[in-house]
């Protein structure tokens, strides 16, 4: 008898009567199609709504479908005082935050902010100028 596994570890790698194979996610045509559909759905959700799912470097962050004209997505370092700086820039510009979420993963964080009105280029530039901000994107 032989033990077959696709999850190698030091214990089974050198064991007698053991066959260790690479783990092949999406190893059938059907699973490849399902993975492709999932990737397209998640990319579309990111582009249209700013939501992130299954990212390697960023946390899952989902505020649902964007129902406002002023959603802003901010990729930034996961450091103290970022949220208050975003709120200060927006408040100083007279922008009201109607909804917001912030999620972090390791060294990076992601903030989605729904505004009652779209942010103009001047506000976006001020957000981009905050130390630790990597990217600001107007979703809608």
Regions found by a protein language model. Give the residues of each.
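A conserved regulatory-domain signal marking ACT and ACT-like small-molecule sensing domains
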Residues: 53-140
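Rossmann-like dinucleotide-binding domain for NAD(H)/NADP(H)
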Residues: 1-63, 110, 114, 140
């Amino acid at each position: 008898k032989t033990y077959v596994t696709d999850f190698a570890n030091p214990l089974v790698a050198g064991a007698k009567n053991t066959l260790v194979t690479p783990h092949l996610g999406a190893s059938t045509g059907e699973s490849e199609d399902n993975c492709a559909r999932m990737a397209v759905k998640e990319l579309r959700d990111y582009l249209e709504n700013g939501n992130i799912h299954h990212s390697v470097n960023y946390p899952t962050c989902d505020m649902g479908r964007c129902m406002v004209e002023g959603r802003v997505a901010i990729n930034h370092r996961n450091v103290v005082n970022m949220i208050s700086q975003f709120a200060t820039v927006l408040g100083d510009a007279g922008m009201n935050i109607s909804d917001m979420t912030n999620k972090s993963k390791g060294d990076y964080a992601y903030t989605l902010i729904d505004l009652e009105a779209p942010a103009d280029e001047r506000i976006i530039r001020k957000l981009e100028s905050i130390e630790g901000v990597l990217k600001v994107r107007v979703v809608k």
